[in-house]
Amino acid sequence: MNLIRIELRKMKMGWYIRGALIANVIIMGFMWLISYSEKADGGVSFQSTDEAFLIIGTFVRAVFIVFGAVLIVKLVISEYKNKTILVMFTYPISRKKLLTAKLMIAGGLTFITILLSNILIAAGFFWLNSICHFIPGELTSEIISQQAVKMAVFAFGAAGTSLVPIFFGMRRHSVPATIISSVVIVMLISSTSPGFSISSVVYIPLSLAAFGLFFSYMAIRNADKQDA
C-alpha cells in the first residue's frame, strides 16, 4: 500500500480527474443530444431503459479503456522508455513489487472511474428523462438493482481489458503501440446495433480481462529480466 501511495503522489492525479470529468460531460451531453434530436423528429432515441443503460455503458467503457492505456504509459512504459525507472530500481524494493503497484493503480483507477462514470451519467440521463420522457416505460427499483450488478461486473471486465495493451507496449517500450492497441480493442468490442453490443456479452469483457491479468502477470514475472 505504501508503494501505491508513493506512486499516486508522484503521478499527480489532477490531469486524470480533469480528463475523466470532461469525458463524463461529453458523454452525458451526447446522450442528451441524441435524445433531444430524436424527440424533435418525432422518434424515440432508445426503445427501453435497458438499451439506454447499454449505450451509456458502452461509451463509458470505450473511453476509459483508452484512459487505462494512458495510465499504463505514464506509470510504466514511459518510465522504461525514458530510463527514469532505473532510479526506482536502485531502491531496496523488489522490481516485481514496484511493477505490481503500478499495474494495480492502472487497473484500480480504471475500475473505479468506469463504475462512478456509469452511475453519474446514468443518474444525469434518467433525471432528464423523468422530465422530458425520452424513453417509454419506468425506471423501477428492480431495473436499477439489476443494472448496478451489471455495472460492477462490466467495470471489472473493462478494467482487466485495459491492461491488455501492456503486452504490446512492453515489447519495445512503445507508447504508440500501447495506445493504438487499446483503441483497436475498443473498436473491436464496442460495435453496437439497436439493443445489442458485443461488449454487453459478459463473457467477452471477462475473457479479455483474463488476458489482461495474464499479460500483467507475465510483465511482473519478467520484471527482473527486463532491461530498462
From Swiss-Prot:
Record-level GO cellular component terms: plasma membrane
A Pfam family annotated for this UniProt entry: ABC2_membrane_4
Keywords assigned by UniProt, alphabetized: Cell membrane, Membrane, Transmembrane, Transmembrane helix
Residue spans crossing the bilayer: 14-34, 53-73, 108-128, 148-168, 178-198, 200-220
Chief place of localization: membrane
Compartments, as annotated in UniProt: Cell membrane
Keyword check for DNA repair: no
Endpoints of the signal sequence: none
Keyword flag Transmembrane: yes
Coiled-coil features, chain-numbered ranges: none
Membrane topology qualifier: Multi-pass membrane protein
Superkingdom of source: Bacteria
Name recorded for this polypeptide: Uncharacterized protein YcbO
Organism whose genome encodes this protein: Bacillus subtilis (strain 168)
